[in-house]
Amino acid sequence: MKTLLLTLVVVTIVCLDLGYTRECYLNPHDTQTCPSGQEICYVKSWCNAWCSSRGKVLEFGCAATCPSVNTGTEIKCCSADKCNTYP
C-alpha cells in the first residue's frame, strides 16, 4: 500500500511538472529558460540610423508583464513556449 501511494505521488509530481518555467527566444536562433515569475515572451523591434541597410533592431526576452514601448517601437507579447519569433 505504501508503494502504491508513493508511486501515485511521484506520478502526480511528474504530471504537474512543478516548477515549470517559460522558454523564450533570446535571439532569432537561441532560447532561454525564463526566471520564475516571468511567463511572458516578447520581441521588440525598432529602426535606428542603420535601419535602411541592416533592418530593424530586435530585442527578445522574458518578462513578468508585457514591456511598455516608445513611439516607433513595435512589440509582440505572448505566453507560450518559443512564441516570440520574428518573421
Swiss-Prot record:
Compartments in which it is found: Secreted
Gene Ontology cellular component terms for the protein in this record: extracellular region
This protein's UniProt keywords: Acetylcholine receptor inhibiting toxin, Disulfide bond, Ion channel impairing toxin, Neurotoxin, Postsynaptic neurotoxin, Secreted, Signal, Toxin
GO molecular function terms noted in the UniProt entry: acetylcholine receptor inhibitor activity; ion channel regulator activity; toxin activity
Signal peptide positions on this chain: 1-21
Tissue specificity of this protein: Expressed by the venom gland.
Coiled coil, from the record: none
Highest taxon listed in the record's lineage: Eukaryota
Pfam family name, one: Toxin_cobra-type
Matching InterPro entries: Snake_3FTx (IPR003571), Snake_toxin-like_sf (IPR045860), Snake_toxin_con_site (IPR018354), Toxin_cobra-type (IPR054131)
Keyword Disulfide bond belongs to the record: yes
Disulfide linkage: C24-C41, C34-C62, C47-C51, C66-C77, C78-C83
Disulfide bond is among the record's keywords: yes
Function field: Binds with high affinity to muscular (tested on Torpedo marmorata, Kd=1.6 nM) and neuronal (chimeric alpha-7/CHRNA7, Kd=3 nM) nicotinic acetylcholine receptor (nAChR) and inhibits acetylcholine from binding to the receptor, thereby impairing neuromuscular and neuronal transmission. Also shows a very weak inhibition on GABA(A) receptors.
Protein family membership: Belongs to the three-finger toxin family. Long-chain subfamily. Type II alpha-neurotoxin sub-subfamily.
Designated name of the protein: Alpha-elapitoxin-Ls2a
